[in-house]
Amino acid sequence: MLSKRGLNPVQAESRKKKKREQIKVREERAKRHEERLSHRNMSQMERQLSELTQLESSQALNAHDKQLLQNLQRDMAIMKKKNIHGHRVGRVESDKTKEAERQHKPRKPFIPKNPKRSIYYDPIFNPYGVPPPGMPYREKEELSSETDESVIDIPLPSEEYPFEDPKPREKKNKSFKPKHHKKQDINASSAQPKSTTTTEAAANTKDIEEETMIEYSAQPVVRDLRQEAAQFLPAAFQRQKLAKGQKIGQPDRDVSSQVQEDKDEEIDNFYKEIGGYL
């Protein structure tokens, strides 16, 4: 062992640093291994472990199978210690798993005998009256015909109902009963139609209310579309019309007369030019 004088502090610090790095690398390697174990299939690992243990009890294992068995045992111990569950595609059928399935067997949904008595009954959305998940089954309370004592003690009013008509109207929808008239011997000459009296006609006219008719009328609106269309003319065209002394919105002169005037003006100019040469 070196004495204190021969100890190099720089070398001691480098050793500590190297040891810390080794511990860090070991931890990272363990984390990566645990992450790989979390993605492994638990059922497949259990199946391989059970097969290798059965094979080991019957015969000796070769080097590869021994190494595989050791790795599986080590991985299973790490998963149990770190509480890593992985995932399961299939499952190993055993007595324990079958017993657990029997104990935790899901119950069938309860269907009441009389669905209409259930408070959850609906003829369209819930015709069986089954309660929703997590809700207890309840039935409707039976309507009792007996009245409460507190309601019986209430005194009835002695007077008539204030909003009731004193003279109720007769019902219009009376049952029709045909009258059976006795046959009478009436001569054709003496038979005359019954004339309606003026009093009955006056009474009928009074009963009929004359409806007042209100008539609404309006005169047609006459619009000058030519004047309105003149607002959309270009400004240069409007100035040209104003220079000619024509109001904006009035129709132009006949096209044929305009063409004739242009021809006459060209002929006059031609004769003026010829007269200058003569």
Swiss-Prot record:
One cellular component (GO) term of this entry? nucleolus
Protein's UniProt keywords contain Transit peptide? no
Matching InterPro entries, A to Z? Answer: WW_dom-bd_prot_11 (IPR019007)
What Pfam families does UniProt report for this protein, alphabetically? Answer: NpwBP, Wbp11
- Ranges of Basic and acidic residues compositional bias? 22-38, 90-103
Q: Enumerate composition-biased segments (Polar residues).
A: 186-202
Superkingdom of this protein's organism: Eukaryota
Can you say what this protein is called?
A: Protein saf1
List membrane-spanning regions. Answer: none
Q: Name one GO biological process term.
A: mRNA cis splicing, via spliceosome
Question: For bias kind Basic residues, which ranges apply?
Answer: 104-116, 169-183
Q: Where is this region: Disordered?
A: 1-43, 81-210, 240-264
